[in-house]
Amino acid sequence: MTSSEHGLKALQERGAEGVVVDVFDAGAVEAAIRRVRPDAVIDELTSLPRDYTPEAMRAAAERDRKVRIEGGQNVHRAARKAGAKRYVVQSSGFFYGPGAGLASETDSLAVNASPGVSGSVRTYLEIEKRVLGSRDLEGVALRYGFFYGPGTYHDPETGSITRQVRERKYPVIGSGAGVYSFIHVEDAAAATVAALESDPGIYNVVDDDPLEMRVWLPAFANFVGAPPPPHISEQQAQELGPDALYYATRLRGASNDLAKRKLGFSQRRLEWLSKATMESGAGPALAG
C-alpha cells in the first residue's frame, strides 16, 4: 500500500503490485488487506520530509506521528481481521537513553530527551506496545538505525544531507560526541524479510560501526568529495534547535548482537569508513 500515485509507480518499477490507499480510511485499508489475505504485514508507515533539515523535521512531526499512530492502528486492526499471523513494524534504534556502552533492546529509550526526540520516542513506544501486546498476532519491532544508501538522506549522489555537507551547511556541533548507529537500506530490507520468520520481539537493526558525529561526519564529507565540515559551538547551534544539539552531543549507539543471533543478520561496513579512519582508533564507538 502507498498513499500516492508516485509511490505506486515506484512500487511497480520494482516489480511489486501496489494499491493507493488513504491510511486514515479504515474501511479502505481493511478492504485492501482483506483482498490479499496476507500471512504477514510489514508496517513501514512514515510521513517524513523529502529533504532533511531540522526545520522540515519539526514541521513534519505531527503528521508523521498521526500516520504512524492512527494509520498504523488501522493497518494493524485490518491485519488481525484478515487473519494475518505476524506483524512487523518500524521503530527506532538511535533514540536510546543515556548509559555506558552500546544499548541493547532491554535498555530504555530517551523519554526525557529534547522535545522532538522525546516526542518521537513516545510515538515509537506506543507503536511497540500495540504491536507486541497483541494476543492473536505475533509482533516484531525493528529498531532501525539511520538509513544510508540509494534514495536516503545520505545517498552519496542525491541525498539532502549529502548536499548540505558539500555546501558546508551540516556542522559538527560542540563535542560531537553523539553516537550514530547507521544501516544500509538494503541490509535493513534483508533484516526485515528475516523478521517474517524470526522469534517475535524487538531487534536493533544497525551496523557494526556506531560512530561519534565528530568521526563519521568528516569521514562522510571526504567520501562524497566535500570539504571538511565546519565546527560550531553549542551556543552557536541554538538556532538549529534543541533536537539538533541532542543528536550531535547525546545520541547513544545501539548493539546489533541480538539481531545477528536471531535474524541471521549480516551487514556491510559503513561505505565511507576508510582504512585510515578505523586505524586511527576513532571508531567504532563503544560508548554514548
Model-derived features: where do they sit?
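Conserved Rossmann-fold NAD(P)-dependent oxidoreductase catalytic core, especially the SDR/UDP-sugar
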Residues: 52-117
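Conserved beta-loop-beta element that borders a ligand/cofactor-binding pocket
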Residues: 86, 91-92, 126-151
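Conserved C-terminal active-site "lid" loop/helix of NAD(P)H-dependent oxidoreductases
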Residues: 185, 214-218, 238-266
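Amphipathic terminal alpha-helices
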Residues: 239, 269-288
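Alpha-helical substrate-binding/gating segment
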Residues: 162-171, 175-210
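Mid/C-terminal beta-alpha module of Rossmann-like enzyme folds, strongest
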Residues: 189-244, 284-288
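Glycine/proline-rich active-site loop of Rossmann-fold NAD(P)-dependent oxidoreductases
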Residues: 100, 137, 148-160, 186, ...
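NAD(P)H-binding glycine-rich loop region in Rossmannoid oxidoreductase-like domains
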Residues: 3-12, 16-70
